[in-house]
Structures are given as C-alpha cells and as structure tokens.
Amino acid sequence: MTTKPVLGISGCLTGSAVRFDGGHKRMGFVMDELAQWVSFKLVCPEMAIGLPTPRPALRLIQTVSGETRMRFSHAPHDDVTQKMVDFAAGYLPKIGDLAGFIVCAKSPSCGMERVRLYDENGNRGRKEGVGLFTAALLETWPWLPVEEDGRLHDPILRENFVERIFALHALNTLRANGLTRHALLDFHSRYKLQLLAHHQAGYREIGPFVASLHQWDDLDAFFVVYREKLMAILKKPASRKNHTNVLMHIQGYFRNQLNNRQRGELRDVILHYRNGLLPILAPLTLLKHYLAEYPDPYLMTQNYFDPYPDDLALRLAVT
C-alpha cells in the first residue's frame, strides 16, 4: 500500500478543464498544500460516460413519481441517468482502498448536498438532492470521508476531513499489513484520546466492542464493523468542551512532574482555550513540551497530538 493516503477527487477541482463550460474549479488548498501529503485518483463522471467538454449543462429532474433523473437542461427528454448509474456501479468497486473523496459542490453528478432539483417542466423544485455519482459513492462506502469543495473552506470541516483521511489511511494500512489481534488493539489504544475528543458517548460505546475482540474468529469481519464505528465517531467534529476534557485528562499525567508555577500555567492555558481566548494549538504545544521533557509511554503513542502532518497547520485556524 502507498505510504500516502489516496483520495478520489472530482477532476475539475485539480485544475483539469473538464467542466461543462470548458473550465475548472481548482482548489488552492487541495492542490497547493494537501497535495504534498496525499495522492489523487481523478474522475469526471460526466466525461467518463462519454460527454465532451464543453457540453450542454445537465440537471437533476425529480419526476412525478419521485424518481431522480439526470437530463440535459436544454433537452429534458435526453436522459443520461442509466449511463451514470452504470458508470458508478462499475467504477467504484475497482478503485481500491481510498482514504477519502473530494467532490464538486452543486454538480448534478458530484454534488454532495443541496444540488438543485427541477420538475419535469423545468421549474426549480423546493427540494434539493445529491449528485448521482456521489449518491452511489455514499451508498457504496458509507464510512468513507467525503467532502465537497465549498464545505472545505470552513476551517473546522477542513480539519475534520483531513483528520479522518489520515485515520482511515492508517487503518487501511493496518489491514494491508495483515490483521492480528495485537495490531488491532494497539491501533485502538493509539486513537483513544482522539476518539474521546470527538464524541464521548461513541468513545464509551466502542470500548466494550473492542474488548470483545477475543470473541471474534474472523478478524476481517471485526475490522469491517470497527471501521464503521471508528469513522462514525471521527465524523463528529471535536468540540471545545470535549477537547478541554481531553486536555485536562492529559494534564493529570504530569501532576507529579510539574511545580506549582508550571501546573498553574498549564491550567490557565487550558482554561483560556475553554473560554475561547486561545486556539487549541496553545495548550497542545505546552503539553507536547512537557511530554518531551517528561516522557510517558502511553501519551507518547497517542495520535491525538499529531493526527496529520504539522505542516498543514490546520489547528492554527481551529479556535
């Protein structure tokens, strides 16, 4: 398996001129920053079904019976729904263990949410839909991190997506190297604090499931369920409250090493973060400093401190 996470991506977001108007929607963050740390598998579903660029615009039509169809806006009876469905059904199972997918917002083929729906007379309806290709993607791999370009401008959603793709890549790598009970338990142990920061109830629910590993004869079957549970927890953006609980938990590991001044400083930094006066990077940096000075075997394994490459600097923007 590649040492880099592999992401599927709508081709237009990489700068490829494949849009219906012959243009593109190149994403600066993805191509100028994230691209250093991941590999891409490009796809333009509309070109993949044989359409040229430029081409007439497509739209999603909701029929009287409630079915969603993909048709040309200028020729509403020219239907390409089945071509798109067939392409997705043939393409998705063959592209390997992706760590995530970035799709083009509002596209009738790739949009993840709020895609315009029209009635059969060409009038815009009240409801909104999902692009046909992305709908198939979400159905095929419900645990896969999927985001669209517009949402990735939000610092919290961006950080959450990147965190998830690196977690899934690590899990995929674990499986590729051969599953063992020890490896699965070690993986979960390294992600405990990270899971706690995302969803306390999910953290408490997944613990007993992992503890039941000895009852599973089929490790691959266990992996499939664990993957679904892990990614569901990480999909919930970590809250300031949950981060504070984790930071205070970590603080307790240094109670015997720090003097009164150091303990007070650390407590104040965590409280300032909790109250929105400092970004999460402030208490994390101080805790990492103390961890380097007073190594703890358990804390040193925790992925919470470095869930993705520091050079992406995503925590600078997360308050």
Residue spans of the language-model regions?
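Extreme N-terminal starter segment of soluble prokaryotic enzymes
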Residues: 2-7
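Acidic, Ser/Pro/Thr-rich low-complexity regulatory regions
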Residues: 146-319
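Short N-terminal binding/cap micro-motifs at the start of the first secondary-structure element
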Residues: 14-22
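Divalent-metal-activated hydrolytic enzyme cores
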Residues: 67-87, 97, 123-190
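Short beta-strand segments
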Residues: 10-11, 44, 102-106
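N-terminal glycine-rich phosphate/adenylate-binding segment common to multiple enzyme folds
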Residues: 87-119
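Short catalytic helix/loop segments, enriched in acidic residues and glycine
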Residues: 23-41
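Short, surface-exposed acidic-centric catalytic microdomains
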Residues: 45-67
